[in-house]
């Protein structure tokens, strides 16, 4: 061999120095690194070089140096052992595991009871049994997540966020796989849909489509929205929340750990804050965050319900004589068609808060649109405490509200024109009756529902019972 190399002047693989070969192998993926074991004895020896497997352990399994030291195994052994356990999820594991780790790290000091409610991961045989029970394959990223944590115990507050109004409370638990299987839908309108979450107060669930059916894409996550104008119970519209389980779960976690969703009284509230939605007038700053409530909204008839949370703060550096009291509010409300409504009234949510240097006042209220989006803006009128005759206005920044993407039920698309027109007329009559009976209400942050305790056994029974009951969507009056 050496004579051949001397004559030709070529280097063979066997004669290359070790360091360049190890450098080349450090760029090889784990599959090719394994295949190198079968190419030659030299490459087989080099591919067992333990530092080569360190990168793959960190990339695919997020194994840390501390975990390696605790298990007292080499990197290659750790990779192989983990692959033997969850190898089928190698394309999803890192993203899902990171989301779980980030979420728990963020919630442990803020919502410890919520973290304690998480269940241990399910076994492969448990997930296989559920697939046999429902007659459908579960998405791999869903299975991967449930190998890490099999949902949570039925507690309030739920892991998937809360929302509270004066007469309405929602808190969504992440279902364990057995309970989810019990709520698997075979009926028309929700065929092949598996519930991911459940709220014991409203009966609301987010679903994942495990098969493509009735106009849904496979693996889509959505809120169901019954068509209230259709006589066909299979007419169920959908608010799309995520294209896949990974998309749905990781985007939610990112909103939580980035501080996008505020933690209030040990609960995650699903308000979204636009950093540009802030206005400062003198020493007073007003900021707004908003949230869409699918359980109080409908596509047919068009009724989109939003709640907003307003924070009013006076700078700590303001002079004491700048202390003031809110007298009134003015709103200019514009829908997607450009229709404008103006509202003016005393105080906010029945209160006349006093703002002084360093003090923060927050409140929540809500509004509805007949279009899928709209915006609000306006101002507050204050008077100084020490100069009561002196009044001034504080700007409320324009804030936009838009419902998620929705998909209309196939049952509606298959309706005849005569049936559609008849239902439109009936809906308009009902809307007029509701408008005649409705009255303005106000709702304060003081009325946010306190932490709720629920018996897990009773909760499980109720959760299974409600799965087969269509959600009743109540109309709430607009609050300004």
Curated annotation (Swiss-Prot):
Keywords: Nucleus, Ubl conjugation pathway. CDD domains: F-box_FBXO3 (cd22084). InterPro entries: ApaG_domain, ApaG_sf, F-box-like_dom_sf, F-box_dom, F-box_SCF_Substrate_Recog, Knr4/Smi1-like_dom, Knr4/Smi1-like_sf. GO terms for molecular function: ubiquitin-like ligase-substrate adaptor activity. Pathway: Protein modification; protein ubiquitination. One of its GO terms (cellular component) is cytosol. Residues 278-408 form the ApaG domain. It comes from the Eukaryota. It is found in: Nucleus. GO terms for biological process: protein ubiquitination; response to lipopolysaccharide; SCF-dependent proteasomal ubiquitin-dependent protein catabolic process. Residues 419-464 are annotated as: Disordered. Disulfide bonds: none annotated. SMART domains: FBOX, SMI1_KNR4. PANTHER family: F-BOX ONLY PROTEIN 3 (PTHR46550:SF6). Part of a SCF (SKP1-cullin-F-box) protein ligase complex SCF(FBXO3) consisting of FBXO3, SKP1, CUL1 and RBX1. Interacts with PML, interaction is direct and takes place either alone or within the SCF complex. This is F-box only protein 3.
